[in-house]
Amino acid sequence: MWLMKEYRNKEVRDLMLLLLSLFWLWCTPVFHNICSVDDQNNFSTLLTILESTTISAVLSCASILCDCLISSALKDKLVGLFFMPRSGETIFSDIKNGQIKDSRFRTSDALSLYTGIMQKLPNEKAARREIENAEWYQIYQRYQEKGSVIQSQRDYLMCRDLFIETLAFLIVYILSVHIFPSVVCFSLKFLIVLFVLSIAFNICTHLKMSRFVTTVIW
């Protein structure tokens, strides 16, 4: 059986382990205390390790909880930064305007195949996007069990969830700096890593979403 979200047990888990490792290394005094440990501060070092471990667990759980509480629609809006439309909302307009670049099909063939849909698209932006997405979704329902569609959808959902997890970790880390100032240190390089990962995953999500949408219609 194909597990659409098996990546949550692999890629998402690996990402969380990476972020927690960097958090321990750069944002807590654990490693510094371990390197300078002696008989007189063994207890202090142990206490620091326990505090850092607890806070790491809190950050991890908070990130996962955020991901679970955020709806799929809100995730899509976050990916689009609240102003970029989903690919399914513009796919037929993009074909009509020659903005689709996909080596798997010619634009002229796609124009011929979906002429009926394009002819009934209204000029008003919101209504047009709603109709385009509805038409695309009807096509998706017919081919959702197709292997190439399943694979492209999995890739898209994986990148989207990696982006959301990184964004959630970024937010809870910033909060933890203010909530646990005695244990959590501000690290500019960790913040940069989180920002870079967020941007990279966002770009990947858009690329995979576009690939998924065009795979459905062809």
Model-derived regions: residue spans:
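Cytosolic/matrix-facing juxtamembrane and C-terminal tails of multi-pass cellular membrane proteins
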Residues: M1-V12, C185, I199-W218
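N-terminal first transmembrane alpha-helix
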Residues: M1-I100, C185-I192
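Short, charged low-complexity linear motifs
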Residues: L121-N123, F195-S198
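Transmembrane alpha-helical segments and their cytosolic interface motifs
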Residues: K5-S21, Y140-L188
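Charge-rich cytosolic interhelical loops and cytosolic tails of multi-pass membrane proteins
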Residues: A73-G147
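Intrinsically disordered regions, especially transient/low-confidence alpha-helical propensity segments
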Residues: S21-F23, N133, T215
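Hydrophobic, lipid-facing residues on alpha-helical transmembrane segments of integral membrane proteins
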Residues: T54-I70, F163, L167, I171, ...
